[in-house]
Regions:
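ASCE P-loop NTPase helicase motor core
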Residues: 77-159
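ATPase catalytic-site recognition across NTP-hydrolyzing enzymes
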Residues: 158-212
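Walker B catalytic acidic pair
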Residues: 73-74
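Nucleotide donor/acceptor-binding cores
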Residues: 1, 46, 99
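Conserved RecA-like ASCE P-loop NTPase motor core of nucleic-acid helicases/translocases
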Residues: 1-13
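Hydrophobic "anchor" residues on beta-strands that sit immediately upstream
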Residues: 69-70, 102
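Inter-Walker segment of RecA-like/P-loop motor cores
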Residues: 11-68, 189
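Alpha-helical scaffold elements adjacent to nucleotide-binding pockets in ATP/GTP-utilizing enzyme cores
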Residues: 16-23, 81-89, 114, 118, ...
Length: 212
């Protein structure tokens, strides 16, 4: 079994790595972290990698890899091409393993537009969206398969543990400018509706340099 969790940059993984360091050894005695390879190794042989994908070209670093689980933390920090490329890496690394992807995210960010279109507005919350795919078979026929996705909304008030441990955090969010406050406190995906073509914003990989 192999899994991988992405943040936009490796530095942003700090909090996730701290939580993994707190949870994994207690739940899986004998689990160890290799700081050079950025991977947790478990006695069963399973591995969980942590990685950044700062530039779109970084996605090809994972060409030839296979992961049973792929996770994106703060999905709106990524472009669609970075996310969709990893579909090709989401395949079983052994018999009987479950293959799936998960992502978390907040409104705003360079990927706000495509994340909203793909998950938020495509169907009501908590409603599975099923897409039919036709896979070619060796005999020339096709096989129907389905991929599912779903949007699970959550607000700060849904995290009772955080509310109890840090009640001042809500006050901090309440003091933000209106658009940021509506996005982060209320989970409002329409607060950034005026940001058109967000996937193209400040992305050096998309620039075309004219040759002279």
């Amino acid at each position: 079994y192999k899994g991988i969790i992405f943040r936009k940059t490796y530095t942003q993984l700090g909090e996730l790595l701290d939580k993994a360091d707190s949870y994994y050894p207690r739940i899986f005695p004998g689990a160890k972290y290799n700081s050079q390879q950025h991977v947790w190794k478990f006695p069963s042989g399973a591995r969980i990698y942590f990685a950044g994908m700062q530039y779109t070209k970084d996605r090809t670093k994972w060409q030839g890899w296979q992961f049973d689980f792929i996770g994106f933390d703060e999905l709106t920090h990524f472009q669609f091409d970075e996310y969709s490329y990893m579909w090709s890496r989401n395949r079983p690394s052994g018999p009987g393993t479950r293959v799936y992807m998960r992502a978390t995210g907040n409104p705003g960010g360079i990927g706000h537009g495509w994340v909203k279109d793909r998950f938020v507005t495509v169907a009501p919350p908590m409603t599975p969206v099923k897409k039919k795919l036709l896979l070619p078979q060796p005999d020339g026929s096709t096989k129907e398969v389905y991929r599912h996705r779903i949007f699970v909304p959550a607000k700060l008030t849904d995290n009772q543990a955080l509310m109890d441990n840090s009640p001042e955090y809500m006050l901090n969010l309440a003091m933000l400018p209106q658009k940021e406050r509506e996005a982060l406190l209320d989970g409002n995906w329409d607060s950034f509706s005026g940001q058109v073509f967000m996937e193209w914003r400040n992305n050096p990989d998309m620039y075309k340099i004219r040759k002279h």
